[in-house]
């Protein structure tokens, strides 16, 4: 991932020193080096509040809470992104597996992977996303 930092496909500029200051070590390793947080440890794995999940690096809105579901995999799972333009997909052949990596389309941050074992009554997709790659913005409660 770090070799993609200057990839012209990603318009959001990233300065490594600034990212290291702003992100936690886990957020940095996940988003910049495609690390994976341990299952069932992420802040948003069990979050059920209404709101929007944003890229922790650039703030792009990525997923709505209405697309989140409990897959039992240990990471937050969504059946679709907020729209088709916010996600970049790339084949990933690491760790002896063939998977589809999911990145933020604005900054290239590694988010997780997408699999074809999601809810069949929705999209059939499971966007398996590291909590460390996300910030959650709760919707204000109505009074």
From Swiss-Prot:
Domain spans labelled MsrB: 16-139
The record's free-text note on cofactor binding: Binds 1 zinc ion per subunit. The zinc ion is important for the structural integrity of the protein.
GO molecular function: peptide-methionine (R)-S-oxide reductase activity; zinc ion binding
Residues the entry annotates as binding Zn(2+): 55, 58, 104, 107
Residues at the catalytic site: 128 (nucleophile)
GTP-binding is among the record's keywords: no
Record family assignment: Belongs to the MsrB Met sulfoxide reductase family.
Cofactor(s) annotated in UniProt: Zn(2+)
Listed HAMAP family: MsrB (MF_01400)
UniProt-listed PANTHER family: METHIONINE SULFOXIDE REDUCTASE, METHIONINE-R-SULFOXIDE REDUCTASE B1
GO cellular component assignments: cytoplasm
Protein name: Peptide methionine sulfoxide reductase MsrB
EC number(s) from the headed UniProt entry: 1.8.4.12
GO BP annotations, alphabetical order: protein repair; response to oxidative stress
Keyword field contains Metal-binding: yes
Reaction(s) this enzyme catalyzes, per UniProt: L-methionyl-[protein] + [thioredoxin]-disulfide + H2O = L-methionyl-(R)-S-oxide-[protein] + [thioredoxin]-dithiol
Organism field: Burkholderia pseudomallei (strain 1710b)
InterPro entries: Met_Sox_Rdtase_MsrB, Met_Sox_Rdtase_MsrB_dom, Mss4-like_sf
Keyword vocabulary terms for this entry: Metal-binding, Oxidoreductase, Zinc
Pfam families cross-referenced by the UniProt entry: SelR (PF01641)
